[in-house]
Every structure is written in C-alpha cells, then in structure tokens.
Amino acid sequence: MEKRRVMKLKSAFGALLAGALLSGAAQAVDITGAGATFPYPIYAKWADAYKKATGAGLNYQSIGSGGGIKQITAKTVDFGASDAPMKGEDLEKNGLIQFPAIMGGVVPVYNLKGVKSGELKLTGTLIADIYLGKVKMWNDPAIAKLNPGIGLPNQAISAVNRSDGSGTTFLFTNYLSKVSAEWKSTIGEGTAVKWSTGVGGKGNEGVANYVARIDGSIGYVEYAYAKQNKLSYAQMMNKDGQLVVPSDDNFKAAAAGADWNSVPGMGVVLTDQPGKASWPITGASFILIHKRQEKPENGKEVLRFFDWSFKNGAKMADDLDYVPMPDPVVKLIQSVWKSQIKDASGKSIY
C-alpha cells in the first residue's frame, strides 16, 4: 500500500514537473521595435495575428525612420525600421544587417472642395514646384493645363510636409530629386530636409490629420494612411509618361525589376522606375538588427516574427495595399539571417 502511494506521489510530482517545464518552454518572449511610420499599419496587423498564433508580443513604436535608426544604434530596441536604407559603410560601422520587410507606395493627397479622389492629375516636377513655393495657387496655369475640365479654385495651396526624420520623406524627396534638377540642387533628398514652404506634421498620421483639416492643402503619405483617413489622392505621371493611380498592382510593377542582391544591405530604392504601370513613388521598408546578439532569445524572436509574417502575412499586406516580399527575396533574406546574425559565441541564431 505504501509502495503504491509512493508511486502515485512520484507520478504526480513528475506530471507537475513536466507541466512546469512545458509552461516554461512555451513562455513567449516579447520584443520591441521602433522606427518608420510607413509600415506601421501592416506591422500592427501582423503583430496582432502573431500574438494570437504564438503568444509572443511586439511593441512597435511608430516614431519615424530617423528615430528607429537612433534607437537600434543605441541598442534600446530589438530592431529598428527605416524606409531610407542605410549605406553599406554605416551598417558595417554599427554592426547591423538590413533587410526589406514590406513594400508600398507614397501618394500625394489633397483637400480640395469639388475635386474627387483620383480626379486631380500631377507630375513630379509640378509637385516639386509646389513644395519649392513656385506654384502657389490651385488654379495656376501649370495645374490647369494638366487638368482640363476640372473646376480648380482660385485658392492658395497649403503644402504639408513631415517635421520629423522620415523614410517617407526620403522616398518623396529622392523621387523629386530624380525628376527636378532645381529640387536636387536646392532641397535635395533625405529623411529630413529644409523645406521652402509649408507646415510640418509628425509621422504619416500627423500629415494625414493636417491634410484632412486644412482646406486647400496637399501632402504626402503612405497609401494605407490615405485610405484609412479617407483622403483624396492624385493620379501621377510616371517615368513612361503614363498617368497611373496608386494600387498594389502598380506598386508591384515598380518593384518588378529590382535586383536586391546587387546593393549592400539589399538597400534598393524603387522610385521613378520604368514601366507603363509603375507607381513613381514606390519603396521598401527595411528592418535593422544587430549582427551580434547580446540577447539571443530576443533576436531569435525578431526573426521568428518576420519569418512568420513572410509565410502568413501576405493576405494581410494585400488587404492594406502593401506589397509582400516575393519568395525569392525571402529566401535571400533568410540566407542572410543564417550567415550573419549570431550570438556571443559566434553561433547562428536562425
């Protein structure tokens, strides 16, 4: 009888121990990221789905690409995010690797009474002249010539830009530098530039809010923000001289010829690409993570999150009009993870 009782106790203890071990093994590691506002809607959607699937959480701070680079460089987050790819020498200096996680489009948005969404037509040089302060009125002959039949008001244009360090601004100004020699020589490109005119909003959210509130305004935001905030967006003339509307198909067309393996850190810039359907201000958003992981469990969880998102998040991306990374690019990214991201002992964490 005593022997049987001891066996039962051992069995119960074993079950409790096994349960405790399983519970410990299943404990999820929460991770932190910070940076670009451009991909925030899709990262938030992926994070919610990933939490439900795995129990692991992501706290992503949508603070702008400049802030994301600062935080990952300072090692205060597990990964940074930027729409402006870091140069190879800067990645090397800071011990970082970079990979593209999602693609999308930056669109000009406007608040103009009587002009429907998608009705206004703009060229890159015209947008540059508006932000240079040369085209000041909505009924300027240059705008009217491109938009016959639209009742453009005799109203001042209020240009809205980004006040923070922004990858969206990098894509916007990189494009304008390609299509306007005057823009390139006076303002140039960057995550933050010295604007000639306009009011600044913080984040894509801030620009969207200003455009929604200010009658006669124009701004630039990632397409998901335009849709979420029900903002009117313009058609644009692309490199092939075709007028195109923003859509995931046209973003895909712009990315079709990208050679991700040819640039250090896969830092391909997709603005002003050829192709009849190409949207002219298309770009990728990049993830930055340290090669040498001082907290390998956190590093592993970052890679698990993006691995899961690449495999399971394509429809979510499509629903928000982002463009998921193609399978061959994902395989290239995974090979970089395997060969370059290691723990303190030099062992790969992927």
Question: What name fits each language-model region?
Answer:
Residues 2-14:
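Bacterial N-terminal signal peptides that target proteins for export
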Residues 2-5, 21, 69-70:
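A general, composition-driven signal for non-globular sequence regions
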Residues 7, 23-28:
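Extreme N-terminus of proteins, especially the signal/transit-peptide cleavage junction
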Residues 12-23:
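Bacterial N-terminal signal peptides
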Residues 28-350:
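Flexible loop/hinge segments at secondary-structure junctions
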